Every structure is written in structure tokens, then in C-alpha cells.
């Protein structure tokens, strides 16, 4: 972080010393002062409230003090402030998107000698789709705005009507790390540096690099749950908009969780490709053609027909398929591919301890997988009862995961699959492990000092939705490291 940038965390109250620039403000928190991105924070609704009110846990809307007309009038004013903030930030955001689409995307398309369509898609993602959706959303908000009595405005329904549209942010957020990598590569060449700077100046945009502008949609989708929570706080339970705001808050939290989950899943595909490349004698299509998540893994005894011969195999349950491998007799860290089962065509049946009527052998901690198309069955036995139960629960989770993916439309593109397999092959060639880290979504940008001329205000730092940790390597860590 630059020496002049202000360090802070979610929940801090920052005193704004200068807000002349729309993108970067100068502020003070505790004993430190410095620049911070304005888009990372939001203004407190009531500037007259002491900061302690925000640092303490805030009560819900139903617990607010509604006694007396003065208290209600104050609450109405604070609801008006929240509504004005929502509309103001949306209008600013629309201008920001328009500047990117007209100032950068349109100009880049004119230079076919510098940019291919694939490059433009990598750099800008689906930002033009986001721009179109946001314009419709702002129009709907303005239609619901009560100009004479703003506190009576009913904005909750707008969020509910457009909640499906916000899911397009998932594609943008997942692509953003690729955009940063491509921009970093291009800006090593002076002609691209000059071109991007010319685009910024012609559009009269502030002095921030393009990757800084492209970060805004990632930040924006995280703001909606916070704004709606603030709106709900100052909405009386008897207000006509109360139930809609409550439902909208829940819906936008789900959207944020969906985006985080999709991002987590896409971060896993490189690891899955690396795992596949470590398996000897792999046959058939790549794992990523149908799967993107390791759900469970472990050692099971496979009892085969017709002699009821038992085999120790390592099983890996992914969404839509179950892979089984054989350990090398001498090198136990090496696995050989032995086959796969299509989970879409299997029925899992619990088998009681005792003599199996099909194979006429005694089994314990067993379950059977029936194949609907071929009529084949696979008898598998765990060592302990609790291991068997974990497998049965994992099979149920796998079916639920597939159902959710179908409902939300989650899928891995052909380009993402190819890139993951290419990365895995490169790593295998070098023999060096590739670090898989979290993309730098919160990249800092340096800016020159700005004159202080704005009255002091206080802002509350945004708390972004927490990202669900991946359990891929947690599952893998229970096994020996698989490397050639």
C-alpha cells in the first residue's frame, strides 16, 4: 500500500477531510490520515449522530424507537436520506459505466490493429450488458421515487423485479482477474499506455488507470445488501415498502452469495485440472467437461462379479461423476486411472450388514450403486460405519449440487476448461507447483494529492460479503499427495 493511502477495515468510521475528487477522498481514522477510494465506503445517513452509534451493534427496524411524532419525523428524514443516497449513487454509477463503454470500449473497437474481439472480451467482460441492465434499473427506481414525500418511496419492489438481472455480475467478477492480467501485459507496451490515457482524457475522466475503473462493478454489487439493510433500518414495519425491502435485502444477499460461490467454483477448476494431470493412464474425456467440484473422496473396497473378488480402490466423487483409481504397490503416492461412473445414471442404495443376496458374500458398511441404463450394479464397502454415512451424505450433496447448478445456470465455458488444462500441462512440464491465490480484487491505485476544500463528513466502511472457503484441498489433504 502507498504511504499516502489510508488503511482501514470494515466497520471503521472515517472522518472525511477532503471529498473534492469523486473517486478518492482524504480522511482520518484513529491516528492516521490518507487517501482512500470513495467507492469503498458510504456516507452515514445522519451526520449528526455520534460515531458510537455506528460502532455499537445496530438494532433492527422493529426495535427502533417510534414513540412520539418527533421521533417518527426524524426517522422519516433518515429514510429520505437513505433513498436519496441510493438514487444518487446509482446515477453516478450509470455515468461511470457510460464513460467506460463510450470512452474505452467504443474506442478500442475502432482499433482492430491493436485489439481483437477476444481481447476486448477479456478486458471488459460483459460490462456493456451490465450498463444496459443498470439503465433499466435506475429508470425503475426513479419511477418509484416520490418527489414530494421521498420517505414514502417504495424501492423494494424494484430490487425484487431486477434480482435476476444482477446475476450477470457473476460473469464480470469471475473475469475480472483475467482482465487485470491482460491489462498488465498490454501496458508494458508504450503504445497501449498512450492509447488508454488518450481515451481517458477524451472522455474527461479522472486520473485513474483503466483497471481502477473496471474494479467499480465488483465493488458495486457488494454495496446493495448494505444499502438495503440501512433502508430497512429506517423503514417502519407498517410502511407499505417494509416487506418488499425485507425481501429485497434477502434476495440481494443471495445474489452476493451466488456470485461468491461461482467465483469459488471457478478458482477450483485449475486445481481439478492439476489433479487429473497427476493421474497415470487417464482415459476418456477430461474431468472439467462435466465436473467442477470435488465433493468427497476416500478409500473403499469394491466387490466385483462374478467371483465376488474384492479390490481396494481410491474413489473421488465429483459433481456428475465418480472416479476410481488404483494405488501403485510400491509408490503409494501414485494413482492409476481405473474407471468412472456417471452419477446422473446411478441410484445409491444402502445395504444392510450381512450376506449379500446377489453376490452371496457377507458384507459390512456397504452400499450399492445401480446403473439405470446398463443394469449393472457396484457394491462398495467402507471400513467403518461413520465412513459409510459420510459417503451416503456426500452422494445426496452431489445430487443437490447438480440441481442447484441447473437452477442457477452455472457452467464452465470451453475457454475456461482449455485454459485450466493448459495451465496444468505447463505445471507438469516444469515440475513446479503453481500457487493458486485469491485474485487482487482490492487493488490499490496511486493518485496525486488533492486540495482540501470540502466540509468534514463521516463515512462507514463497507463490509463485503465473505467468500465461502474452498473445501477442495481440505478433502485432498486427507490423502497422500498425488504426483508423478
UniProtKB/Swiss-Prot annotation:
CDD domains: PH_Collybistin_ASEF (cd01224), RhoGEF (cd00160)
InterPro entries: DBL_dom_sf, DH_dom, GDS_CDC24_CS, PH-like_dom_sf, PH_domain, SH3-like_dom_sf, SH3_domain, SOS1_NGEF_PH
A Gene Ontology molecular function term of the record: guanyl-nucleotide exchange factor activity
Record-annotated DH domain positions: 78-262
Keyword Metal-binding: no
Expression tissues: Expressed in colon epithelial cells. Highly expressed in CNS, including hippocampus, olfactory bulb and cerebellum. Expression is aberrantly enhanced in most colorectal tumors.
Organism domain of life: Eukaryota
Location of the PH domain: 293-400
Location relative to the cell: Cytoplasm
Residue ranges of every copy of the SH3 domain listed in the record: 1-46
Any Gene Ontology CC annotation: cytoplasm
Annotated region described as Disordered, given as residue ranges: 51-75
Gene3D superfamilies: Dbl homology (DH) domain, Pleckstrin-homology domain (PH domain)/Phosphotyrosine-binding domain (PTB), SH3 Domains
Record keywords: Cytoplasm, Guanine-nucleotide releasing factor, SH3 domain
Coiled-coil residue spans: none
Domain remarks in the Swiss-Prot or TrEMBL record: In an autoinhibited form the SH3 domain binds intramolecularly to the DH domain, thus blocking the Rac-binding site.
Function per UniProt: Acts as a guanine nucleotide exchange factor (GEF) for RHOA, RAC1 and CDC42 GTPases. Binding of APC may activate RAC1 GEF activity. The APC-ARHGEF4 complex seems to be involved in cell migration as well as in E-cadherin-mediated cell-cell adhesion. Required for MMP9 up-regulation via the JNK signaling pathway in colorectal tumor cells. Involved in tumor angiogenesis and may play a role in intestinal adenoma formation and tumor progression.
Assembly information from the UniProt record: Interacts with RHOA and RAC1, and APC. Found in a complex consisting of ARHGEF4, APC and CTNNB1.
Protein name: Rho guanine nucleotide exchange factor 4
Organism for this UniProt entry: Mus musculus (Mouse)
Amino acid at each position: 500500500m502507498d504511504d499516502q493511502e489510508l488503511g482501514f477495515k470494515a466497520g471503521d468510521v472515517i472522518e472525511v477531510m477532503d471529498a473534492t475528487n469523486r473517486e478518492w477522498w482524504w480522511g482520518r481514522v484513529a491516528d492516521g490520515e490518507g487517501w482512500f477510494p470513495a467507492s469503498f465506503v458510504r456516507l452515514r445517513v445522519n451526520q449528526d449522530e455520534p460515531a458510537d452509534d455506528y460502532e455499537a451493534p445496530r438494532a433492527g427496524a422493529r426495535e427502533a424507537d417510534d414513540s412520539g411524532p418527533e421521533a417518527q419525523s426524524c426517522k422519516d428524514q433518515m429514510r429520505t436520506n437513505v433513498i436519496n443516497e441510493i438514487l444518487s449513487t446509482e446515477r453516478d454509477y450509470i455515468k461511470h459505466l457510460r464513460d467506460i463503454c463510450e470512452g474505452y470500449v467504443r474506442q478500442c473497437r475502432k482499433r482492430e490493429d491493436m485489439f481483437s474481439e477476444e481481447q476486448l472480451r477479456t478486458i471488459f467482460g460483459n460490462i456493456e450488458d451490465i450498463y444496459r441492465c443498470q439503465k433499466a434499473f435506475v429508470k425503475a427506481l426513479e419511477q418509484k421515487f416520490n418527489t414530494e414525500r421521498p420517505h414514502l418511496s417504495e424501492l423494494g419492489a424494484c430490487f425484487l423485479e431486477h434480482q435476476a438481472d444482477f446475476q450477470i455480475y457473476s460473469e464480470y467478477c469471475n473475469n475480472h482477474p483475467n482482465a487485470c492480467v491482460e491489462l498488465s501485459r498490454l501496458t508494458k507496451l508504450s503504445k497501449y499506455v498512450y492509447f488508454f490515457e488518450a481515451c481517458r482524457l477524451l472522455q474527461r475522466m479522472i486520473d485513474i488507470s483503466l483497471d481502477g475503473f473496471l474494479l467499480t462493478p465488483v465493488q458495486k454489487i457488494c454495496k446493495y445488501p448494505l444499502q438495503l439493510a440501512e433502508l430497512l433500518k429506517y423503514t417502519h414495519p407498517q410502511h407499505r415498502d417494509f416487506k418488499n425491502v425485507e425481501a429485497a435485502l434477502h434476495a440481494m444477499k443471495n445474489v452476493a452469495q451466488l456470485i461468491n460461490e461461482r467465483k469459488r467454483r471457478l478458482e477450483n477448476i485449475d486445481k481439478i485440472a492439476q489433479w487429473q494431470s497427476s493421474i497415470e493412464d487417464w482415459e476418456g474425456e477430461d474431468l472439467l467437461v462435466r465436473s467442477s467440484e470435488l465433493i468427497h473422496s476416500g478409500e473403499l473396497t469394491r466387490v466385483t462379479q462374478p467371483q465376488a473378488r474384492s479390490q481396494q480402490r481410491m474413489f473421488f466423487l465429483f459433481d456428475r461423476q465418480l472416479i476410481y483409481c488404483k494405488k501403485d504397490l510400491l509408490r503409494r503416492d501414485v494413482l492409476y486411472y481405473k474407471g468412472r461412473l456417471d452419477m446422473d445414471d446411478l441410484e445409491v442404495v444402502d445395504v444392510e450388514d450381512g450376506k449379500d443376496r446377489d453376490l452371496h458374500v457377507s458384507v459390512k458398511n456397504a452400499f450399492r450403486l445401480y446403473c439405470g441404463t446398463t443394469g449393472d450394479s457396484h457394491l462398495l464397502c467402507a471400513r467403518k460405519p461413520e465412513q459409510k454415512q459420510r459417503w451416503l451424505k456426500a452422494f445426496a450433496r452431489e445430487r443437490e449440487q447438480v440441481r442447484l447448478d441447473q437452477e442457477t445456470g452455472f457452467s464452465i465455458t470451453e475457454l475456461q476448461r482449455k485454459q485450466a488444462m493448459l495451465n496444468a500441462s505447463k505445471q507438469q512440464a516444469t515440475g513446479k507447483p503453481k500457487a493458486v491465490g485469491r485474485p487482487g480484487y482490492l487493488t490499490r491505485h496511486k493518485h496525486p494529492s488533492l486540495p482540501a476544500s470540502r466540509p468534514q463528513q463521516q463515512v462507514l466502511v463497507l463490509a463485503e460479503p465473505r467468500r465461502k472457503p474452498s473445501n477442495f484441498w481440505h478433502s485432498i489433504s486427507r490423502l497422500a499427495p498425488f504426483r508423478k
